[in-house]
């Protein structure tokens, strides 16, 4: 007996993906495998988004509005327009700022030297809190007559790290 169906006939074997990736495709995904089909859909969506963003830049659309771009099928993707950030430049008075020029400290170039014995220290120099660089012999504060007050700095650091907590006095009943 011969069985005839009107319209659709099932293919006799599995169909390879049209991108020749080695996987099998289906008629529902345009003879592509699921991976290639998803990649194709993503590329189409990106192309549509790029085209719409270029159109909005060229046409000068408002930055605060949202536009809805129809994607494949019944899905819709809301695309928020990116507001262009403008840089506000305020003109300054050239004559008024000539007296207010801030002095920028010069960075020492050349060989690094000990501030006490003037010995070259290079990369092995020790920076002190007083702002100078010293060799291994003069790196300690008692060896180079350091002007930095370590006692006050330590006292301030401890006070800052451990604040005094005083509770209010309780009323006697």
Curated annotation (Swiss-Prot):
Zn(2+) 1 binds at residues 17, 21, 33, 36. The keyword Zinc-finger applies. GO terms for molecular function: DNA binding; zinc ion binding. A zinc finger (AN1-type) spans 108-154. This is Zinc finger A20 and AN1 domain-containing stress-associated protein 4. Induction: By cold, dehydration and salt stress. The gene is SAP4. Keywords: Metal-binding, Stress response, Zinc, Zinc-finger. InterPro entries: AN1-like_Znf, AN1_A20_ZnFinger, Znf_A20, Znf_AN1. It comes from Oryza sativa subsp. japonica (Rice).
